[in-house]
Amino acid sequence: MVTSVRGRGDIQVCSTTLQAGVGRVEVSARTTYAERRSPLDSASVVDRPVAGRGSPVAPAVDRPHRGAYPAQPSSEPAAGLALANLTRTFGTRTVVNGLTLTAGAGQVVGLLGSNGCGKSTTMKMLGGVLAATSGTFTLDGAPGGVGALGVKARTGFIPDVGGLFPRLSAWEHLELCARLFAVPNWRMRGAGLLADLDLDGATHERAGEFSHGMSRKLSAAIALLPGPGLLLADEPFDGVDQAGVDSLCTLFSGAAARGAVVLVSTHLLGVAESLCDQVHLVKAGSVLAAGTPADLAGSGSLAGAYQRVLSARQHAGR
C-alpha cells in the first residue's frame, strides 16, 4: 500500500489494503465469555453514545452451546473456514506442514502452540499477506489467497506485530479503515470499540506513543470495525493486561455470536480453555491433536493435555 501522511487528518491512500484491518487474546476461571455482553452487537455499539462511559448495559447475546452449530444443506458450500494441506516453506525449511482443519461459522477456534510452531505463518497465509507454497483454504466455499480480494474484504486481521501507522491517532486509524471498507455508522461503532478496550482516553494520541498492549488493542479495534466474516487474531493477548484480555475475549465471542469464524493463535492455554469452542494443538507446523478444550483436557487442564500429547509424540518418534 502506498500511503502519504501530510499531517494529522490529512491522509492520501493509493491502495485498498490496510494490514491492521486487512482487506487485511491468563484467565484463572473457566468462564464462558459468550455469557457476557457483546460490545459489538449492533444494538449495543451502533446506538451507543460516543462518550462510551455511563452507557446502558447492552443486552446479552445468546450463543449456541459448543458444537451445537447446525449442519449446512449439502447443496450449498459449507459455511466457515476450511484448510486443506496448507503448507509453507522458506528455502529448505518447512514452517507449516500440510495443515488441515475446519472452523465452523460462529465458532472460536484456537491454534495453540509454543513460539515458532507456525501459528503466525498460518495467519499470514489466511490473511492473504503471504502466499502458501501448496495447499488451499476456503471461506464459505470461496477460495482464499493473496489475490482473493473477495475473501480478503471479509477478513479482519490482527497481526502479531506491526500494522499501525506511528503518526496516525487511534481515531484516524479507524477512519482510514472505515473509508477503505465503507463501514456504515463507523463513528459510533468505533467510539464504542475504543471504550470497550479502554482506549477512549487515548482517542487522539498517535499510535507511535502507545504501549505494546495499547497497540494490540487498537489493532483489534481496527480488525473488528467492519464486522468481518473471518477474524484472525495472532497472539492478540501479548502485552495486554488482564482487563484488556477479558475485553478482547468478550469482543471475540461477540463476533462469533454474529456468525463470524474467529481463529485465535496463542500460547496462553488458560485463555484458550475458557474462550475457544475447538482447539488445535500445533507443533512444527502440524496439528498434533484437536477437539474441544474439555475433551482434550479430560479431568486435568489443557496445558497438561498439551504436554501429554508432546510426550507421546516424542516417544513415538524414538
Regions found by a protein language model. Give the residues of each.
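Helix-to-loop junction immediately C-terminal to a conserved catalytic motif
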Residues: G127
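Conserved ABC transporter NBD signature motif
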Residues: G135-V146, V151
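Conserved ABC ATPase "signature" region
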Residues: E175, R179-A202
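Catalytic Walker B motif of ABC-type/P-loop ATPase nucleotide-binding domains
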Residues: L231-E235
